[in-house]
Amino acid sequence: MAIYAIGDIQGCYNELQQLLEKIRFDAAQDRLWLVGDLVNRGPDSLRVLRLVKSLGDRAITVLGNHDLHLLAVAAGEAELHRGDTLDEVLNAPDRDELLVWLRHQRLLYAEAGYVLVHAGLLPQWSVTQALGLAQEVEQALRGDDYAVFFEHMYGNSPHGWRDDHRGYKRLRVIANALTRMRICTPQGDMEFKFKGEVEKVPHGYLPWFDLPGRKSAEVTVIFGHWSALGLQVRGDVIALDT
């Protein structure tokens, strides 16, 4: 059995199929770990969702910001952006089945010294704490009033974590860290506009994974989201958004 980790697919079904053929993926015994952003930008989000869903427990995916955006649009709590390629999913006959499945995916997964997340973990979060916080958002997504979460999801503040955050403000910080973060201050204050190369990170900020004392440094975090990083492989992180 082999486990293959794959970066942001973003609706690129043909490229995904070519990759699976190249690695000779065998759904009977191999597993896929997907860093999220299954949908949007590419032309075939619908086929990507159908394929990953069909793999059942052979594929583990965490949710990315584009996946959450699709769910928010479908719930009537967000508008499509220019350049979105989600219409085919939203108009599909199996739309509801696919969206329910997507809502029930994780935001964070940990196994055997590896952690799978779309964007990153705040420096003050241990893996155990982060898993618990991710479950708070997952429960909101899976509940009957999930649309209320999407009503409050968008926004950049609060910029950092505090244990006494409550309600949807708390859930927003958790979701932003796990699905949108690239850089933050040593205190864990996030900045969301920057998308460039590491060498151009604004003064006072660092890539989340380079912060001294990061509590998740004892595991290898597999993530995507930051395309300007390219492929990065080191002991404590593997970046796959290439």
Regions found by a protein language model. Give the residues of each.
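Active-site-proximal beta-strand elements of phosphoester/diester hydrolases
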Residues: 2-10, 114-120, 238-240
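Acidic, glycine-rich loop-and-strand cores that form catalytic or ligand-binding grooves
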Residues: 166-201
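Active-site neighborhood of divalent metal-dependent phosphoester bond hydrolases
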Residues: 46-49, 54-169
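Active-site neighborhood of phospho(di)ester-bond hydrolases with catalytic His/Asp-centered motifs
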Residues: 6-7, 33-36, 61-64, 221-224, ...
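Short, basic, glycine/proline-bearing loop/turn elements
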Residues: 31-36, 79-90, 190-197
